Amino acid sequence: DFFEPLHPSFFELTTAMAFRYFADEKVDVAVIEVGMGGRLDCTNIITPDLCVITNIGFDHMQYLGHTLTKIAKEKAGIIKEDVPVVVGKVSGAVKRVFTMKAKAMNTFITFSEELKSFTHVQYLSYDNLKESRADLQELLEEEIKLQQIQTLPMKMMQFVSLINPADAIRAIDRIMDKRKDAISIHNSSFMTGLYYELSGLCQTENCLTILAALDILKNLGYEICNKDYHTGFSNVCEMTGLMGRWQKLQSYPDLICDTGHNADGFKSIRKQLKYIHEKLHQELHIVFGMVSDKDISSVLELLPKDATYYFTKASVKRAMPEDELMKMASEAGLKGTSYPTVVDAVRAAKENCPPKDFIFVGGSSFIVADLLANRDTLNLH
């Protein structure tokens, strides 16, 4: 009786349900993610301890605007008086939007790029991880004690280091047990660092944002110790249930899925696919589908032209029909075959792809959802 006259959207209704559930359960920490934009989003009713804004890209433009500054202004709407804010990778006019909003709200703002001057972030393959583990084991056996980290010359930022290489070894073992690649995070003041389970290239930027946010939370009184950093970064998928972020589902051939669904997301995916093709000498087989309301042409222009494509559609009404997508892709110089379902497309890719090569599945969160829902059918474990 209360909700029906308001005609809430699905997201608005489930947000209200989540808030009620969190209150009833008296959760220690609630992480609330904006649905779209920020200023007018239903989640913006709360006053949090910390606001985090990730990188700004072109998405939902029919609602948020057709320039990055307009989109940034909508996202800046979550910045509140005296609530610190962390902002991910941004530049130029977009950075000024957030700086001016933070000044108007009398709050402290941190841009994660400020960490780059004293932080080294690197993608590590599975073999690289084995080498890092061997080096750490040598440190441990020689009982080298690492220096205590000094306060860094940056407001509210005291970077986190491990005290004992054993923590890093345990973190690497957790990742290697899952046959995964990783992101390593090192600071110039210490010899060993953090190992991040999410290994997509975009995570090299995201992990800086996470570190900045965690450091501010520590300053606000949250109890976060060094061991928590190692456990959290190396075990994030199991602890959160997060799926579809450059997630490996099979070896021989490698099969990776990713939920990137716009041009901004595919810029990182393109770099990773280029590395796989040119450096690892693996031929690419790409299962691809999108929803109709995205800027499909911009994404198609970013896809490698020397790959074999399996065009398909997800099991949602918004999905672009596979034959229409294949026609658009053909005009962009991409060659392949269309399949009515994700299962059909992935099955064809697995049959055609030699063990030494590589299968990528993506283009839409719904494509990845269909894939993950059919892991047993496709024998992906």
Residue ranges and their predicted role:
Residues 88-89, 103-135, 139, 166, ...:
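Beta-strand->loop->alpha-helix junctions that form or flank phosphate-binding loops
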Residues 22-28, 276-281, 349-357:
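Glycine-rich phosphate-binding loop signature in dinucleotide/nucleotide-binding domains
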Residues 91-97, 101, 109, 166, ...:
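C-terminal helical cap/extension that packs against the catalytic core
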Residues 1-46, 62-64, 70, 92-93:
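ATP-dependent carboxylate-amine ligase catalytic core
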Residues 364-381:
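Glycine/aspartate-rich loop-and-adjacent alpha/beta segment that forms the canonical ThDP
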Residues 38-40, 47-105:
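Conserved catalytic-core segment of NTP-binding enzymes
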